[in-house]
Amino acid sequence: MVAAQDPPNAPHIPVLLEPILTRCAPITGTWLDGTFGAGGYARGLLEAGADRVIGVDQDPLALEMAADWAGDYGDRLRLVAGNFEALDAHAGGPLDGVVLDLGVSSMQLDRAERGFSFLRDGPLDMRMAQHGRSAADLVAEEDADMLADILFHLGEERAARRIARAIVAARAVAPITRTSQLAEIVASCLPRPKPGQSHAATRSFQALRIAVNDELGALVRGLEAAEGALEPGGWLAVVTFHSIEDRIVKRFFTQASGGAGRANRYAPETEDTPARFRLEPRKAIAPTEAEVAANPRARSARLRIGRRTAAPAMPADRAALGLPHLYTLTETP
């Protein structure tokens, strides 16, 4: 399931913050917010009693905007420029809790120049850290087969091959450099959405953003880093917004809680290992109707929480996590 993008000027409200604070109570010690964004989770943790919060974000703009209020918390809040995939290094010591919100923040969507949104015309960029290959580069350089694989595996777009062929045909006429260009190409390949349905370009934009930022590779590395950094009794709370991410997080926690993970029913079973996490609760937490009414962005969100045991950390069985067989998502950097 893919959530529609926020309407223009929608405020960024931390999703499922209350169940995180309630389930992980009492909030004490040192926490790391690996997707700092507008700082909603970090502030919530500090107000709930965390002694210290380390806010990590790879987007320079997020940290720049936080400068206006971060000083109010003194040395209780430390901001770090970087990706949460290396959160153990950013932490500089053991942690009592880690929070990851895997959605794109509203302040990124609201800025047309960042190129994340099909609702606003801007350069086709989509880079969180603002370096490396952009979405425009990817659209210009990859062949139709690779583009189709990206759209299908990372966006679950059923019309992936039709859209990929349309992109290749369009770029032969003129470079695709604007979000509006790409949105129009995608929309031309699909039926007009019914009222209440997501924009036709939602899945394609999601897929390109994930590919540009290697989001699934970073997610797996971040989950492993969190496992290694957390103290026994520490909490890992992960908020996802689409089924691909949620499947990976679910299977990671299944493995780490002592269950044998399998990539599919035909794969050989693996032996159970000592539980490194206890799931609290065992199933994902969905937002309440009241939260969705107050914050439509929360509609597709799912929260999974695990509590670290004293068992030694170990790498995840990546073949069993459900990672798409695409790019280098299963590779260790």
From Swiss-Prot:
Signal peptide, first to last residue: none
Pfam families in alphabetical order: Methyltransf_5
Domain of life where this protein originates: Bacteria
EC number(s) stated in the UniProt entry for this protein: 2.1.1.199
Function: Specifically methylates the N4 position of cytidine in position 1402 (C1402) of 16S rRNA.
Classification via InterPro entries: RsmH, SAM-dep_MeTrfase_MraW_recog, SAM-dependent_MTases_sf
Annotated catalysed reactions: cytidine(1402) in 16S rRNA + S-adenosyl-L-methionine = N(4)-methylcytidine(1402) in 16S rRNA + S-adenosyl-L-homocysteine + H(+)
GO cellular component: cytoplasm
Protein name per its UniProtKB record: Ribosomal RNA small subunit methyltransferase H
Keywords: Cytoplasm, Methyltransferase, rRNA processing, S-adenosyl-L-methionine, Transferase
Sample GO molecular function, one term: rRNA (cytosine-N4-)-methyltransferase activity
Enzyme class, spelled out: transferase
Compartment annotation: Cytoplasm
Binding site for S-adenosyl-L-methionine: G39, G40, Y41, D57, F84, D101, Q108
A GO biological process held by the record: rRNA base methylation
Record-linked PANTHER family: 12S RRNA N4-METHYLCYTIDINE METHYLTRANSFERASE, S-ADENOSYL-METHYLTRANSFERASE MRAW
Family, similarity comment: Belongs to the methyltransferase superfamily. RsmH family.
